[in-house]
Design a protein with these regions (language model features):
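Binding-site signature for planar aromatic cofactors or substrates
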Residues: 1-101
């Protein structure tokens, strides 16, 4: 799959399931710090493409779509994972936490 193509729906669903079930706290962290929604109380990954990860955040009891861009286009699951880890680490640094994922 090359840049400019979207991921297969099954792949997006698998990645979203893992992010939402295993890393829900990271979703909120990413949305608060990198997604411009510091008041988010919850966030679920809702999709992705080669350019960004998408979330549905809860802000003041309202569902808000949030798109957080990758540092570079991604073309496979390993790159998505690396970008998710980068996002979490960058978000932690923004909050003064230097511990890496």
């Amino acid at each position: 799959m090359g840049v400019g193509m979207t991921f297969e729906p099954e792949v997006v669903a698998q990645i979203a399931r893992q992010m939402n079930e295993d890393h829900a706290d990271h979703n909120v962290l990413i949305v608060r710090t990198l997604g411009g929604q510091p008041d988010a109380t919850a966030a679920r990954m809702s999709g992705l493409d080669e350019e960004a990860m998408e979330f549905e955040a809860t802000v003041h009891d309202i569902a808000v779509p949030v798109r957080v861009p990758f540092s570079a286009p991604v073309t496979d699951r390993q790159q998505v994972r690396a970008e998710a880890v980068r996002m979490v680490n960058e978000a932690k640094v923004a909050l003064g936490d230097t511990g890496e994922v």
